[in-house]
Amino acid sequence: MATIHELHKKLVNKEISAVELTNAVIAHKAKVEPTVHAYLSDSHDRALATAKLVDEAIAKGEAISPLAGIPGAIKDNICIKDEPATCASKMLENFVPPYNASVIERLQDNHYISLGKLNMDEFAMG
């Protein structure tokens, strides 16, 4: 398993593309998700679109942030515009925020790749 720093180097050195890395994580997720049930929702299309933007920036020789092109996920109590934010609660099962949390704005500004929302104890009370 590689660190974020190691993956960043591989992206910058064009040893792997952000799209390839994102697809690899999506494939691994598909294998383990039926057993672990970690995700409440996914955003693969948005993730791949961001990965493509990162690859284009690298191809142009632009500097990228250390988080650019790095796939991961966000706990379900963090608001992402137009994605469900249920806090793993039935009470909020239909809530879709019209805004991003500040942390999401920062991650998106740095082209972090979110694959979806992660399960958790209801309202993070566990």
Where are these regions (language model features)?
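An N-terminal boundary/leader segment
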Residues: M1-A49
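Short glycine/serine-rich loop/turn segments
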Residues: A68-G126
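Flexible, acidic active-site loops/lids enriched in D/E/S/T/G that coordinate Mg2+ and/or position polar
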Residues: H44-L67, I74, E93, P97, ...
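Conserved SET/PR domain catalytic loop and adjacent active-site segment
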Residues: E15, E62-A63, E83
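Short alpha-helical functional segments enriched in proximate histidine and acidic residues
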Residues: H28, V32, T50, V54, ...
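Short, polar/charged, Gly/Pro-enriched helix-capping and turn/loop motifs at alpha-helix termini
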Residues: V36-Y39, G61, D121
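Residue-level detector of short coil/turn "hinge" positions at structural boundaries
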Residues: S17-A18, I64, S114
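Generic non-transmembrane alpha-helix signal with a bias for helix starts/N-cap capping motifs
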Residues: I4, I58, N100-A101
